[in-house]
């Protein structure tokens, strides 16, 4: 049943998925140098997982072309800090905010058999020496607090709980915070996971239905890139 529903989702979005596959292949060589430079840099860091590197090229394709540009970046789900470090290392003038519980989250989310104290300690050490805003809290609570304080961001990366309900909640709150013409990037939305009660793509699809006149999907493969247009 999981595979059938995912197949139908992919079929419905076949055009954008196909275009996204070609784009990823096309730009791979373009970001080869900066990816290698970043990979060399993180050899001295302590990362047990490097999932983010799978999407490095497409991530940078949508980030500013000028490495000196001043922009605001928020990520939900920082884990050991690899994606945040990528921004801090490659964009010295960026303003980075990270949100993570570094603890057990929604009971419907995929279980992670890790020591979260150790994960948070790695995060702190990996980003040592950089200036950024770290928020340790539930993502929806943190996002609403940022909204109350009138924060806004140019880029928001959603990589927290992959349960569809949480993806939808994070996306709705992120929409309120992202600037017009700003981007929301969703991690790992085109997958089926038997350990999750409601799949990520279901939450993503619902978000797109709610805001269909206010957003534009630019990219959809293993990650999704959405632009806020109004």
Regions from the PLM with identified roles:
Residues 45-49, 60-230:
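S-adenosylmethionine/decaboxylated-SAM
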Residues 6, 29-31, 228-229:
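Positively charged, low-complexity intrinsically disordered regions
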Residues 20-67:
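Class I SAM-dependent methyltransferase Rossmann-like catalytic core
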Residues 3, 55-58, 83:
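Conserved alpha-helical elements of sugar-nucleotide-dependent glycosyltransferases
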Residues 2-21:
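N-terminal auxiliary segments of SAM/dcSAM-dependent transferases
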